[in-house]
Amino acid sequence: ASALAVMLLEPAHARTQHLLLEASCIGGSCIAVCWLAGGIAPTMTPFFLCLLLGFVFFDRPLATVFGLALMVVTWVMVPVPAEVVSGLVIGALTVFVVMRQANKMSAILVAGPVAGLSTALVYGALSGVAGERLPVIAANAGYLVAGGLIAAAFAVGSTFIFERLFNVATVMRLRELLDTGNKLLAQLFESAPGTYHHSLNVANLAAGAAQRIGANWLLARVGGYYHDIGKLLHPQFFGENRGELPNIHEDISPELSTKVILEHVQAGVTIATGHHLPAEVIDIIAEHHGTTVVQFFYDKASAERANLSPEAFRYQGPKPHTRESTLVFLADGVEAAARSLTKMDKAALEGLIDGVVSARVTDGQLAESQLTLGEIRVVKDYFLASLISFYHVRDAYLSAEEANERS
């Protein structure tokens, strides 16, 4: 069933397919051994294991489809009584209910035992009505409960090992990273509150755009949350964190200002690696400025020195190479530029978005991305609608009409 899901369903990210195939080998081998061994006792552990792993690897709707397919495969492959099949249905429904709003791996430690217990209760009740001997019912019910416990422990343990071994972003791991109370985001909020709120806005823009074009919205949102964590190194050098403090850049050279600003990308990669963030998220951090030039300080330095090369003012990249990374890259530029607008209306926002995106296309920053021209248009339209809503922008004629009504 896991292998079938790899072919028919799209996991959280292409890299995750490798991890899922590893899990398929484990679960498939267990089912094969249990099928040969026969009996109820060993069969339920791999069933619950694969069911739980579905919620680790897939979004919830896909995990539900995966679970239904798994029940059918188990019913066909493993000769178990109707009482057990009925119990499995209830157990699977229990997993769906428990995992429906789960955002942490610890939920699996609850879902597995509860599923095993509910399956055992249904099996016991139906077997009792069918006249099965009590010792047999008790033994098999115990096996079912144990199967849920073992599956939960194995799912959590194996997922942790695989995530660390292959450094991939499972759906459950990404959901954990969305918790704004975790240590890294809490530190960002405390030390760089302006950057923190900017990151939330970027995440909202990137995730919404990802949903519109069928990209991985969950990865885009997480990437938006963490893309600027490198600013923790020198938060006071970035305007959104300055507040009422003096502008430190007025007292230093444009070259030094640029050096500190450029460093935040590599600092973010270092911090993310130290906190064991998935490789896909680290890629977004590394690529969120591409190879663009820190234009303000380049222009400032050029005014002081003629024929100045822009290379010393250029981010090292690489350029964004996935749709999710590109969306964060574009959302970052658009959100930052929007905050600097003095006149906030639809025409100004539309011109700003067109300008930011066109400049990046012309500069070749999207050359390695996977976005089509049609998708870029969809993204721009979404950015515009989202920013209009966020800034409560009204058309000029509506504002004038309201003013007349209130006068």
Predicted regions and their residues:
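Generic recognition of stable, solvent-exposed alpha-helical segments in well-folded globular domains
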Residues: 48-52, 64, 85, 89, ...
